């Protein structure tokens, strides 16, 4: 982890943004190396947002493994700093519906929304985010024709997704699960799919994919790395 490596990683992603590619596949990058090089980005998604977004586009993180798909409403942010608003939730999920229509040819995708708090807040006893933010967002989205559930307890919501994944079902209950923060969505999909999980950046004019895992410096030079993640990332844009 050095400033030189961070600078090389940054310039590589920036160059990919500049050449007019229809899709970009990136390898994992060490965020601390970006910081050492003076580039204060929390990840490659944020770099893509800076150099490719226009007309108020939002780059979002969609994770997929075959029929199991998860959208994150927030990206690389500390739990104490999560700041969801009704307007932001509505915008991100409308973008997601547009992406499903354009790229997956699903006109009316079914979305399952995770509750923010344990047991989806228990009617406000365990937290007010569902009442103050998520339920009003769902009401607005339904007015716009979005097929979305109310906030559901996240600890049980993903059980069905895991079963469908292992049974390799092509017909699923929900086309995408919507998580409020990073670990809420990534723990379930990575637990069942492992290295087959792909990170897909949506919301921009191009699609970017990368393996769902990190740099794995702990196994560097040991000849035990598994290329599955990179292969799946490449296949996802073809």
Which functions belong to the PLM regions below?
Residues 1-238:
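Anion-binding alpha/beta catalytic cores of soluble intermediary-metabolism enzymes, centered on
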């Amino acid at each position: 982890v050095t400033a030189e490596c961070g600078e090389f990683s940054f310039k590589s992603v920036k160059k990919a943004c500049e050449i007019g590619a229809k899709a970009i596949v990136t390898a994992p990058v060490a965020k601390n190396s970006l910081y050492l090089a003076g580039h204060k980005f929390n990840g490659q998604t944020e770099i893509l947002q800076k150099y490719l977004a226009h007309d108020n586009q939002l780059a979002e993180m969609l994770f997929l493994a075959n029929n199991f798909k998860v959208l994150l409403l927030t990206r690389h942010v500390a739990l104490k700093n999560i700041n969801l608003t009704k307007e932001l939730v509505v915008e991100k999920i409308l973008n997601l519906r547009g992406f499903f229509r354009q790229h997956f040819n699903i006109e009316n995708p079914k979305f399952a929304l995770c509750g923010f708090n344990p047991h989806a807040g228990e009617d406000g006893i365990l937290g007010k985010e569902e009442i103050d933010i998520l339920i009003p967002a769902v009401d607005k989205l339904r007015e716009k024709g979005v097929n979305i559930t109310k906030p559901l307890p996240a600890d049980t919501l993903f059980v069905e997704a895991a079963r469908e994944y292992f049974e390799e079902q092509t017909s699923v209950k929900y086309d995408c699960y919507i998580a409020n923060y990073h670990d809420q969505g990534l723990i379930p999909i990575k637990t069942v799919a492992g290295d087959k999980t792909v990170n897909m950046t949506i919301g921009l004019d191009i699609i970017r994919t990368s393996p769902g895992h990190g740099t794995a410096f702990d196994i560097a030079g040991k000849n035990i790395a598994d290329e599955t993640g990179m292969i799946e990332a490449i296949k996802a844009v073809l």
